[in-house]
Amino acid sequence: MAVISMKQLLEAGVHFGHQTRRWNPKMAKYIFTERNGIHVIDLQQTVKLADQAYDFVRDAAANDAVILFVGTKKQASEAIKEEAERAGQYYINHRWLGGTLTNWDTIQKRIARLKEIKQMEVDGIFDVLPKKEVALLNKQRARLEKFLGGIEDMPRIPDIIYIVDPHKEQIAVKEAKKLGIPVVAMVDTNADPDDIDVIIPANDDAIRAVKLITSKLADAVIEGRQGEDSVEAVEAELAAGETQADSIEEIVEVVEGANEN
């Protein structure tokens, strides 16, 4: 059984790519057709490749891999945080700071500063400091939490990075490639898939699409860490909603109908 059904992908709008003039020709093999100036992603490939991504992440998680979820665009920010936390993993959902991976020692120093400020409050030091100084410390803490809070407890450089929109997160992709870290990514029709190790062709601009794919990869982590029993509910949900388009022609009919509305 597929991890994500065709019906789920269609309902979440995973099939809608970018305008044809914004495409990357390297994504041609993942594009089914063009409708009204929009590329339509081949969801039969998405189903297959999502399965491969799920298995890859699950198997890595079973071996205690550290997985970093990355998505800083507004459509991805909330889902990245929620699903990474649900899976007991780590995330960056605001701006990617250059050197997050390649200059990990410096990043760790900033994380140590964040923890130091938090501990100062716990120890009651804030109570004896001037209000102006406390305000400055709180401002510093807020900024550090915004950019580093999701990796505050990450024990080491991640073993895998999952990225929503590698076109936007090019710095993260380059750092991962430099360090030999595998990248799993939602790749839209405007992106370059060459540096992505595990590709999931998908609309990365729709909140529902991002949530769907990201939640399934979080499920993969949970299954890998806890065993198949932990995802019985997920499988039951899939079985209940397994009615799906059986052919690529049916997908086109659905897509054309959606475009006309």
Swiss-Prot record:
Residue runs in coiled coils: none
Record's keyword annotation contains Ribonucleoprotein: yes
MF-aspect GO terms: structural constituent of ribosome
Pfam families: Ribosomal_S2 (PF00318)
Any one GO cellular component localisation term in the record: cytosolic small ribosomal subunit
Superkingdom as given in the UniProt entry: Bacteria
GO biological process: translation
Presence of keyword Ribonucleoprotein: yes
Keywords for this protein: Ribonucleoprotein, Ribosomal protein
Family indicated by similarity: Belongs to the universal ribosomal protein uS2 family.
Protein name stated in the entry: Small ribosomal subunit protein uS2
Organism this protein belongs to: Streptococcus mutans serotype c (strain ATCC 700610 / UA159)
